Every structure is written in structure tokens, then in C-alpha cells.
Amino acid sequence: MVTSFLPSLFVPLVGLVFPAVAMASLFLYIEKDEIA
């Protein structure tokens, strides 16, 4: 019954972790572009 626990881990991963990584990478890209 591993699949029953999969959505409870997949939803927060996509809903919280992915946007945080996307915002961090975008922020670093903008900062690097302004400094260069």
C-alpha cells in the first residue's frame, strides 16, 4: 500500500518545494545578470 501514501508526499513536493526552487533559481539568475 505504498501508492496510498504517494499523493500525500507528491502534492506538497510539487506545491511547495518546486515553486521555492523555481523562485530561488530565478532570483539567483536575476542577481547574476545584474552583477555581470
UniProtKB/Swiss-Prot annotation:
InterPro entries linked to this entry:
PSI_PsaI, PSI_PsaI_sf
Any single biological process term in GO: photosynthesis
UniProt keyword Transmembrane helix present:
yes
Membrane topology field: Single-pass membrane protein
Residue ranges annotated as transmembrane are 10-30
Q: Which GO cellular component terms are attached?
A: chloroplast thylakoid membrane; photosystem I
Keywords associated with the record:
Chloroplast, Membrane, Photosynthesis, Photosystem I, Plastid, Thylakoid, Transmembrane, Transmembrane helix
Kindly list the places in or outside the cell where this protein is found, as annotated in its UniProt entry: Plastid, Chloroplast thylakoid membrane
| Record-linked HAMAP family | PSI_PsaI (MF_00431)
User: Belongs to which family?
Assistant: Belongs to the PsaI family.
Role of this protein: May help in the organization of the PsaL subunit.
Protein name, as recorded: Photosystem I reaction center subunit VIII
The record lists the organism as: Nephroselmis olivacea (Green alga)
